[in-house]
Structure formats: C-alpha cells, structure tokens
C-alpha cells in the first residue's frame, strides 16, 4: 500500500491480511504523523517515495518491492472482512494453476463497498485489488490509476464480485474533512487538464472529484465537456460514469424539465451506456413526480442491467437496493398491482426487516377487509419466512406492528409465541416496547 499520514488506519490496514501474506509492503510518500512508526512496529517493510503528484508512479514503485507471486494492493482505508480473508488463499491457489497454463497475468475483480460515516454502504463498485506479480502489469494514470499491460488495459480478469468484498471508508464526509483528499485530487486533475486540455479522461475524473466535493455546477461543466468530445478513446466505465453522474446531478438539482433529463439519458443510450445507474436516476426522477408506470419501467430495467453489469466503477444503485425495492413496492401498490407490490415488498424486508412502513402496508395488503384468526394465521405463516419467530427481538417487533395496525388477532398469535421470560419482560416494559 502507499500511504501518507494514515496513523488512524494503518494498524487495521496491516491487520486484516496478517495471517495470509508473506510480506507487507508500505510505501510512505511523506507522512508527518506516526504512520511509519506504527507500520515498522507491526513488521511491515517500509519504503520511502518522494511524492510527485502521480499515484501510479508511487504504486508501481511499491509493486517493484514485492517478491510474492500475487499482490493484494489495498489502500490504508480499505480492508477485507475476516470471513472473506479466509477465501483468498484457496482462490489464488486455484488461479495460479490457471495462470501458469495460460502464461498471462491475472487480476481478480472483487466488489468494493464505499461506507458512510455510519458504516452503511452508499455505493458499490467492482475493483481489481488482487493481481499476479509480473513485470509488464503496472498501474497507469496519475490519479484514478488503472492496471495496464504494456499500455493496454489488462484484459484477463477473474470475477469474484460475489465472493470477495473490499470495504472502503475513505469516502466519508469525516475523512474528506480530515484529509483534504478531494482538494488534493482536484488540484492534481486541474493541473493535468491545464497541461493537456484534450485529456477528456482527466476531465471526467475532475468531474467526479468536484461532484464528491458538492461542487455540482463545476462538475456538470466538466462532464458536459467530456460528452461534447465523447469518443471510443474513453473506457466504457468512464463513459458510463459520466452519463450516470450527469443524471445524478439533474436529479439532485431538482430539475423539473423532463426534456432536459431525457436528453442526457438518450445520449447515454446513443453511446451504449451499460451502467444501471442511468435508468436508476431516471426512475427516481419519474417516481418523485408521480409518473409511476414510467418510473417502474426504468427501475425494472435498472435492476435487469444490474444483474448483467460486469464493469468497474461505482454504482449508487447497488448501494441503495433496499430503496429501489421500497420505491417499487409503493409504486406497484399505488397502481393496485398487488402481486408485484408483494414481490418487491418482500425483497425490501429481506434487506430492511425492521422497515415499519413497508411491513405495515404489506400486512394491510394481505389482510384486505378480512378479519379473524384464519387470516392472521396466514399472515403469520408468511412473516415466519422473513422473521425468526424464536427470537425475542423479532417477536416483539411484530407485536408492536400488530398493535399499530390494531390487528388484535395477529398480536395475540405472536404474543403466544413468547416464552414465559419474554412475556414477563413484555408485560413490564410494554409502553417502551410499543413506543407509546
């Protein structure tokens, strides 16, 4: 990893893989805190590299210090979970055999979840953080660097998106404020485009950094310049990201002119945009304005595209899937399409089991105008597929929902599932549990 002033992260960064790596390489680019001291204390090999506003140069220097057959190149604010770490060596053993047969470098693409200040995933991307250690596989690009083979994007990748996830904490507002990372990136990219105004990839990355820094107007200008000069020289992922972020800007700018929004979307179709976020933002815009059927169509298309998408790049939609299912539930319910509403409501509750509003509407849909123990039993049978009825928390939650709905029969059925100790606890704390 390359680091600068990462004393808050370096210990965790060097801990996750301690038991599976043969060496840990830390390249410091000018820390003034305890980063180097902590890294050396933890047994890492520490090297120093003079910062020259070029992430690829620093990363390639780090690669040159590595002696293993495979490299895990994570930033100091990234880590694999303990569970996923255990999967890495068996996977690499399998891939090493394949690599020797093919005699070409291999990279492993895993999911990357960007976490907010509360630890929730805000977006999900696919990134290459594991790759074979061979001479011609190196990073390219002064910022937002990409693995290349002899100047050409690495073509061979093993898809491990469903197997491995890197968690990234570096995009939180707290980190931005503490590190001034965005200002640094914006400064580097502005210098790049000043030096070469026709470097539209750099303009696209500048738009990303400006947008992350909440400079939406400036970001929009940068993206529009890229669209004006759009061609096949840009990687597919970059083209996708430009269009998706332009649509995102229109959405958050609360643009009311549908033509203005759809002009961008149609342009994205013209350039064969594959990313599901394009349809996602159009779908959100439509649903916000009560255009339910069209909103549903775009959201469903976004979900279909998400299943097929195998490119790099962040996806806001992937970090907001529960929101997608929740919005589809409400739209289908409003249109009286109960079957589709139940399907999406169920998917939402699998992700957000304690989402009261959706659960209450689901129960109302099932109940209709029916009364009595029979309908309550049928609903409880359905709920047992979503909730653990041996778990006190789930039972007490369902009792609270039943009380809010004044569904006495369902409340009684769930109450009777409580153990004696749970009933005693409920009877003592009823007002607090029910939120009354």
Question: Whereabouts are the PLM-identified features?
Answer:
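Catalytic-site signature of metal-activated, phosphate-bearing donor transferases
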Residues: 57-63, 81-218
């Amino acid at each position: 990893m390359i680091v600068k002033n990462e004393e808050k992260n370096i210990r965790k960064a060097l801990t996750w893989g301690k038991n599976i790596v043969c060496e840990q390489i830390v390249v410091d680019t000018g820390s003034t805190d305890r980063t180097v001291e902590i890294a050396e204390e933890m047994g890492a090999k520490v090297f120093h590299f003079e910062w020259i506003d070029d992430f690829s140069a620093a990363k390639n220097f780090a690669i040159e210090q590595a002696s293993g057959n495979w490299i895990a190149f994570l930033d100091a604010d990234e880590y694999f979970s303990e569970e996923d770490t255990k999967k890495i060596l068996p996977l690499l053993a399998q891939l090493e055999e394949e690599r020797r047969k093919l005699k070409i470098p291999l990279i492993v693409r895993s999911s990357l979840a960007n976490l907010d200040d509360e630890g929730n995933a805000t977006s999900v991307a696919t990134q290459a953080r594991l790759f074979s250690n061979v001479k011609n596989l190196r990073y390219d690009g002064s910022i937002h660097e990409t693995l290349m083979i002899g100047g050409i994007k690495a073509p061979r990748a093993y898809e491990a998106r469903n197997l491995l996830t890197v968690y990234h904490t570096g995009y939180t507002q707290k980190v931005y404020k503490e590190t001034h990372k965005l200002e640094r990136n914006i400064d580097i990219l502005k210098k790049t485009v000043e030096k070469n105004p026709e470097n539209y990839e750099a303009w696209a990355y500048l738009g990303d950094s400006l947008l992350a820094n909440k400079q939406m107007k400036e970001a929009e200008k940068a993206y529009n310049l890229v669209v004006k000069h759009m061609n096949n020289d840009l990687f597919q992922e970059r083209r996708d990201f430009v269009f998706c972020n332009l649509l995102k800007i229109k959405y958050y700018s609360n643009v009311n002119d549908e033509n203005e929004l759809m002009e961008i979307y149609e342009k994205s179709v013209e350039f064969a945009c594959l990313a599901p976020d394009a349809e996602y933002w159009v779908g959100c815009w439509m649903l916000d304005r009560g255009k339910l059927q069209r909103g549903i169509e775009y959201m469903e298309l976004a979900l279909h595209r998400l299943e097929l998408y195998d490119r790099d790049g962040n996806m806001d939609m992937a970090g907001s899937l529960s929101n997608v299912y929740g919005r589809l539930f409400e739209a289908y319910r409003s249109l009286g399409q109960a079957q589709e509403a139940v399907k999406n409501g169920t998917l939402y509750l699998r992700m957000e089991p304690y989402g009261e509003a959706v659960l209450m509407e689901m129960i109302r849909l099932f109940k209709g105008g029916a009364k009595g123990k029979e309908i309550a039993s049928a609903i409880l049978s359905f709920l047992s597929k979503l909730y653990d009825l041996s778990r006190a928390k789930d039972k007490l939650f369902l009792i609270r929902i039943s009380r809010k709905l004044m569904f006495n029969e369902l409340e009684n059925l769930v109450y009777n599932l409580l153990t004696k100790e749970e009933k005693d606890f409920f009877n003592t704390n009823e007002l607090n549990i029910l939120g009354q």
